[in-house]
Each structure stands twice: as structure tokens, then as C-alpha cells.
Amino acid sequence: MYIQILGSAAGGGFPQWNCNCANCKGYRDGSLRATARTQSSIALSDDGVHWILCNASPDIRAQLQAFAPMQPARALRDTGINAIVLLDSQIDHTTGLLSLREGCPHQVWCTDMVHQDLTTGFPLFNMLSHWNGGLQWNLIELEGSFVIPACPNLRFTPFPLRSAAPPYSPHRFDPHPGDNLGLLVEDIRTGGKLFYAPGLGQVDDKLLAMMHGADCLLVDGTLWEDDEMQRRGVGTRTGREMGHLAQNGPGGMLEVLDGFPRQRKVLIHINNTNPILDEDSPERAEVQRRGVEVAFDGMSIEL
């Protein structure tokens, strides 16, 4: 299985266009040793030719331009994208679909709850129906596994995550299973397994068991501290309120990942306020000391 990190930042990217927190300001004035990042999205393939896009970032055009296999140039109009999987209906995971309209129709896999959001509060399915068939919906059931024909050697097992629907959603304050998903992706030839959960607010025994069975854990790296947004003066909500488990402290993501010495561990969906973006920070050193990697745009993983 080929895993390509197209974007590794949380919503807004890094540096965020309107932010002057220590990280964003430091990156712009050159006082911070850090790497710019686009908003999170990954691509998966079983042959390096046919790719499944997981979430469609607002930065999708730049991400595809930076990854040559996404333009195989076999025809006058071409793309390496053969299917799209949406883990939720958040704006920073779906807006990129608008930029892919010239390539419609697209096969899109998502839950019923995500499809409801994308036909009501943010009606992308309706809007894009005017472009050559638009988005062709394939239902993700919450029980069992599924295979996408373009990559027949990859088996996807979805699992619901506890998190809120987007602010625009008609059921924002009435959460349902299927609003947010993680994925366990297995290459049935090699046996390699990826646990992918860019929005992970709580880890229960069922998830721990799935993580133990995986070879690579690509998980939520949004915040270092639960009250980071408040400390930095850029927000009022905690990480847990937003559905993100912070890295630091008792019960934090790093403590969870300490229990997986065999697995490759990678943090993704990193917010612009997170001090691990500063490559010289003690927080970054602590992450590395504990055997955890920080995802970056263009990172490649094979399982």
C-alpha cells in the first residue's frame, strides 16, 4: 500500500492566512525553523497508479501539482484520482471537491450523515450535479468493510469517531454515528494495515484493539495542549470540545501512543498554534524522543 500525505495541517493550513500567533509570525519573519503545510488530505493506492483521495482539501490544486502521479498524462485530460473517500463533511475536508469539477463524474464514498450535510447545509452534491454527472454517491455503512474497485487490493474498515458535525450542519447539536469516521485500511496482499484518524477526540478499548492490529498509526496531531487555542488568544474552545485529543498531559495522545512500540506513529492534522511545528522547540524534541513522527506535505509511507 502506498500512502501519500498531500496535506498535513489542520483547517487554515500553516501559516494560516490571517493568523499572527508565534508560529505563523515566526514562519513569516524567518525567526522560526518550520515547514509550511497545507490542509490535511492523503491519497492511497495499491499500485502507485490508481489513487483514492481521502478528503478533498481547499488546497487540493497545489497538492495535486506537487505529487506527479496525480497527473499520469495518459490522455489530453487525465488524473490519477479514481475515487474519493470523505471522512466527514467539514469545510476543510470537502471544499476541494469544487476544484475537481472539471473531472466529474467522481465516485465519492461517504456515510449517510455526511451525504445529508452535503445535500443540505453545504449542498456540494446538488451544485456539482451540473458538471458531467457530478458526484456519484457510494454509501459507507458503519458495519463491515468495503473495497473500492479502482484499488481492489485495499480493504477499508470504517469506524465512527465521537465528534461534532460542522457548524453549518442542520444537526450540529444532534450528533449521530457517521458524522465523523476513521479508517482501518489493509493491503490484502502484503497484510500491511493503516489506522487513519485525523480527528480523534477519545480513544476507547475498541479503538485501542484496532490500533494494536495496525502497522502504521496516522492520527490526530491538532493540538499540544487541550486549552491551546485559549492560551494563544486565538479561540475559546478546547481540543476536546472540538473532537481533538491533545498530545500533552495524562491521557494525551503521546501517552496513548507510548503503548504501541511496534507501530510506526505519525501525527497529522496539525494546527498552526501547535509548538511541534517549531523544529527547535522542546515539544518537538519530546515528540521525537517518544518515537513519534510529525507528518509533512509530500511524506510517503509504504506498507
From Swiss-Prot:
The keyword Acyltransferase does not apply. Pfam families: Lactamase_B_2. CDD domains: PQQB-like_MBL-fold. InterPro entries: Metallo-B-lactamas, PQQ_synth_PqqB, RibonucZ/Hydroxyglut_hydro. Pathway: Cofactor biosynthesis; pyrroloquinoline quinone biosynthesis. Keywords: PQQ biosynthesis, Transport. The keyword Transport applies. GO terms for biological process: pyrroloquinoline quinone biosynthetic process. NCBIfam families: PQQ_syn_pqqB. May be involved in the transport of PQQ or its precursor to the periplasm. Belongs to the PqqB family. This is Coenzyme PQQ synthesis protein B. It comes from Pseudomonas putida (strain W619).
